Curated annotation (Swiss-Prot):
UniProt main location, coarse: cytoplasm
Keyword Membrane appears in the UniProt entry: no
Stated name of the protein: Protein FdhE homolog
UniProt-annotated location(s): Cytoplasm
Function: Necessary for formate dehydrogenase activity.
Encoding gene per record: fdhE
PANTHER family cross-referenced by the UniProt entry: PROTEIN FDHE
Molecular function GO terms recorded: ferric iron binding
InterPro entries tied to this protein: FdhE-like_sf, FdhE_C, FdhE_central, FdhE_N, Formate_DH_accessory
Keywords from the named record: Cytoplasm
Native organism: Actinobacillus succinogenes (strain ATCC 55618 / DSM 22257 / CCUG 43843 / 130Z)
Gene Ontology biological process terms in this record: protein maturation
UniProt-listed CDD domains: FdhE
Domain of life: Bacteria
Amino acid sequence: MAIRILPENEIKQVASSFQNPPLLFSSPQNLYARRAQRLRQLAENHPFSDYLLFAADVVEAQNLIFAENPLEKTEFTFNQLRPLDIKHWPRSAKWREYLSALLAEIKPRANEQMIGTIDCLEKASSEELERLADKLLVQEYAQVASDKAVFIWAALSLYWVQLTQFIPHHAIMENAEDLHTCPVCNSVPVASVVQFGSNQGLRYLHCSLCESEWNVVRAKCTVCDQSKELEYWGIDTDKETVKAETCGDCHSYLKTVYQEKDPYVDPVADDLASIFLDIEMEEKQFSRSGLNPFVFPAE
């Protein structure tokens, strides 16, 4: 799957003709504030409220760090195919600055176990931190302790989200192949989002790293592209803002959040808060195909 950044003279032409739905880029100016608010809302009377509130603290720290130390705009040469590909992008040391700031922000509120994790990361060498980041980015999650992974990923994501702001945002997908991973950075999604507003009813996958969204047609598996064995599962609630889409062909599942049911849903926050749905899917022998940045596979 490739994306193409349109020159100015093509933008109006494309707007008046049929094209694939555009890529959507998150704005860090409001992404983190909205997510933190949603996490705190979902934490009310939740069995895992403490962890949801911890996640909100991390997101608020991302927001603060972005405001105080934004990534300086640099002229980049972007490839057409996944311009910020995690496997090839020469990331700078800026993400480690973000990690240090994140740890410093969270430490005063951390419990004893978390302080041990923070101390370990603060003492780690640059080489060790880069090694751990490499492992996470190529999905070798078992090589990184899950408590460390949350902080490292939060710093990497803050870095990658800002990189997307330097890509001209009039970009389209050239084809519909290999849609399971992000066309911008090649990371896996956290969940699907069924949109409302101008994109009413369209399904987008939301990237777990750079927070971009790309369109994938509904009623087909986001992993194997099959459509015959799809089923949808939800927890019994009034709104059912979150459902799991399971595929009987490849035995994977990915959750979907519905903006039309609740305009304040957030793919990361609502996916995390619906962890009991994950437990049900695992009991039914389905494997999660996405990644929530606050729930890494255990060692």
